[in-house]
Every structure is written in structure tokens, then in C-alpha cells.
């Protein structure tokens, strides 16, 4: 028997603040919104950088200890090179350049696309308290600062999925 169980709601949790981690969440959230799926995006811990006004468009790629890091063209970059001063900034600049060539929008614009399509963006109360962030420090796209329990209430329901990126 081949039954289909459609996804009706996607709730993503973004806990890391590197370019590749934040964009994984943004791309999946935007895709869900475009498919007409109810979408919640919850930022916690270092993922909060993606919704903090002063940091959201200044994310970096972690180079130290990243064994999957490749240069354009696919050449492997030894993680030991990450200790060279300026390597993280250079790698992040290259990554952003590649994304611009593919017309992938900056974080602030991505948040606009997601919310314009009906997606909801939330900040974690514990992380906001830890980092001493207030609602006014966050992007205008943030619908609220929630406890994890409040987020789970919004994430619940038949056909719901929670994805941790």
C-alpha cells in the first residue's frame, strides 16, 4: 500500500550562525513557503546572528575544522589553512561572491521573501536573554521572542515536521 502523508507544516530550528548553516535554514524555509506549506523558522544560540540587525548580513564561513570546505572548482582546502590570518574573511567573501552569481539573496532579503510568503520567524527567549538581545535589536521580520515550549505549540499538528539545521 503506497500511502502519501503530505507535509502541512514545517518548523525549522537554526542554532548555528555560519553562512552555510543559516542558508540551509533559509533555503528550506523559502522552499516550504513557495510550496504553500505553513512555515515557522526559530533561531536560537548562534543562529540568532541571522536575525540580529547588526550581524545578519555579516555572517562568515567557519574554516577551521571544516573538512568539507572546498574552493571554487572543487579543490579541497585543508582545514589547517584556516589558521592563517584573514582566511575566514577571504573564504566568506568568496562564498558570498558565488552566492551572488547564483542570485541567492542576502539574509535580510531572504527573511523578507519568507515573511512575504506567509512564513513566521521567531527568536529563542533563552538565547535572547543570554546574549542580552531585545526585540528592537532583531530584524523587523521577527514575529516574536518565544520559549521553546511556545515554539513547540506552534510547530504541533498533523502533517508537521520539525527540522533542526
Predicted features by range, described:
Residues 59-95, 99, 103:
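A glycine-rich helix N-cap at a beta->alpha junction
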Residues 12-22, 51-52, 98-102:
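Short, glycine-rich nucleotide/cofactor-binding loops
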Residues 23-36, 41:
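Histidine-anchored nucleotide/phosphate-binding helix
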Residues 47-60:
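N-terminal beta-loop-helix "entrance" segment that forms/cooperates
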Residues 88-154:
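A charged, amphipathic interaction segment
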Residues 1-21, 27-30:
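N-terminal glycine-/serine-/threonine-rich phosphate-binding loop
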Residues 153-164:
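Gly/Ser-rich helix-loop-strand patches that form or flank binding pockets
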Residues 39-45, 122-125:
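Short internal beta-strands
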Amino acid at each position: 500500500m503506497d500511502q502519501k502523508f503530505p507535509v502541512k507544516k514545517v518548523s525549522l530550528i537554526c542554532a548555528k550562525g555560519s553562512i552555510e548553516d543559516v542558508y540551509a535554514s533559509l533555503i528550506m524555509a523559502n522552499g516550504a513557503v513557495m510550496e504553500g506549506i505553513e512555515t515557522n523558522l526559530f533561531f536560537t544560540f548562534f543562529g540568532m546572528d541571522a536575525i540580529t540587525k547588526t550581524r545578519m548580513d555579516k555572517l562568515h564561513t567557519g574554516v577551521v575544522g571544516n573538512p568539507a570546505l572546498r574552493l571554487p572548482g572543487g579543490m579541497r582546502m585543508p582545514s589547517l589553512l584556516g589558521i592563517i590570518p584573514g582566511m575566514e574573511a577571504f573564504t566568506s567573501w568568496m562564498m558570498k561572491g558565488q552566492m551572488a552569481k547564483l542570485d541567492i539573496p542576502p539574509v535580510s532579503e531572504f527573511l523578507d521573501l519568507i515573511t512575504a510568503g506567509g512564513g513566521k520567524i521567531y527568536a529563542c527567549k533563552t538565547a535572547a536573554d543570554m546574549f542580552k538581545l531585545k526585540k528592537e535589536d532583531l530584524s523587523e521580520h521577527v514575529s516574536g521572542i518565544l520559549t521553546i515550549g511556545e515554539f513547540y505549540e506552534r510547530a504541533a499538528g498533523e502533517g508537521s515536521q520539525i527540522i533542526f539545521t
